[in-house]
């Protein structure tokens, strides 16, 4: 892409913008494109197939130039990765408002999106790529860890501490990019063995370098031997295998390899980002661009073969789930009629957490100093002394997770918890315990910020899977509450036409104004999750609303 260059975020406490409220989005935009963070930084692609941080390098330069001069009573407007205006607002307003990839429903198809993208009119923002709060593979790691912990409660048995474990089980998955790369470490943190398949050897090498993957096998026979030995010894191990999942999954099924858990996190949401059988890795992007319709058909046929094998494992007694990449629907379109025989991960494991407003709470140290994250880790443990799962996660993350770009951390916190962490971080900045401000955000995958019938809102109790008012309300609420930047995206995770979602990021800069904003944003944002699930009829959400004082008019008499 014209204008490509290496980008890294500034570190330290010296401002390059006019305040931390504008320095923060500037640094996080740059961090998204750090070579240690982004999948294809020269193309502005951060993760998730083609999820970009900016539409093109000229737009990137325009965003950077504007953020360095933006005042604290001004708001930058970003339309699908392109800076389109600056308006005078007020100090409580967001400094940046972002809308990415949004299309009128009848036009919300991949072919139409690609036509508009080719004209330079839009870009695919994924979830945290175009909203500038991607923190590398760690960003999805705890959610993946929690998912496999829930799987362990179904298929595993308690370890010495009485906690369900995946020890003695083998998980098969595919896709080891920015999102899928969390899977091998999440499985091993839960005590299990993981075999992860990816067509790109460089992705596997990168996950080994960042300690998300233990080792790479020399071939299928070697991979199976390593995994079966570790499973027999009840030893945690993750093994990468270079191969195409559409070939490997059916072959493992044919061999009768005893696999306990099966999922997938390839970029199936975009058929052009899934390599079909018979296409060489080096020919991938050229073939996809030359004949996109033919490539899409071939990719879907390959997905159909992979999903058919997944259903074969299901029939053989394995725990099988869709990890939110639309592979079931793509396989259905590829001609496989049992594609929905297994559930998505949210209804299977995560929805009880969403009913409590619990979801991915992440923060990054703008200083670039890992000591600041270590200090915030201690603060979180101090704030929530009775949360054993949280303590186990924070300790494991501190020991096992390598930082990518600016040091960062993620943990799942719920309604009534997130604002406590935000306020504590702000106090630590004010006192000098932290050497620079902290940015606090989340994935768009959260309790009340997504409409995605194949993922976050699949199988809602009241049938409201496709109701998209909720993420729009979420963005409006965060804008009204004082978030530093707010985003509304379309198509993240599951692909164009299948989701609407919103995000927020807030800055803890140590000021009283920041404290007031943080208390509102970090209360109201997860509060939307409780409200959404109360409205859908979830009893646990009703209990949380009553216990924690969330007002729901239709529940008031």
Curated annotation (Swiss-Prot):
Compartment annotation: Cytoplasm
GO molecular function: urocanate hydratase activity
UniProt KW Lyase keyword: yes
Cofactors (names): NAD(+)
Catalytic reaction equation(s): 4-imidazolone-5-propanoate = trans-urocanate + H2O
InterPro entries in alphabetical order: Urocanase, Urocanase-like, Urocanase_C, Urocanase_central_sf, Urocanase_CS, Urocanase_N, Urocanase_Rossmann-like, Urocanase_sf
Entry's cofactor comment: Binds 1 NAD(+) per subunit.
EC number: 4.2.1.49
GO biological process: L-histidine catabolic process to glutamate and formamide; L-histidine catabolic process to glutamate and formate
Gene3D superfamilies: Urocanase like domains, Urocanase superfamily
First-tier enzyme category under EC: lyase
PROSITE patterns, per the entry: UROCANASE
Active site (catalytic residues): 411
Keyword Lyase belongs to the record: yes
Record key words, sorted: Cytoplasm, Histidine metabolism, Lyase, NAD
HAMAP family hit by this protein: HutU
Family matches, as PANTHER family: UROCANATE HYDRATASE
Annotated function: Catalyzes the conversion of urocanate to 4-imidazolone-5-propionate.
Full protein name: Urocanate hydratase
The organism of origin for this protein: Beutenbergia cavernae (strain ATCC BAA-8 / DSM 12333 / CCUG 43141 / JCM 11478 / NBRC 16432 / NCIMB 13614 / HKI 0122)
Gene label: hutU
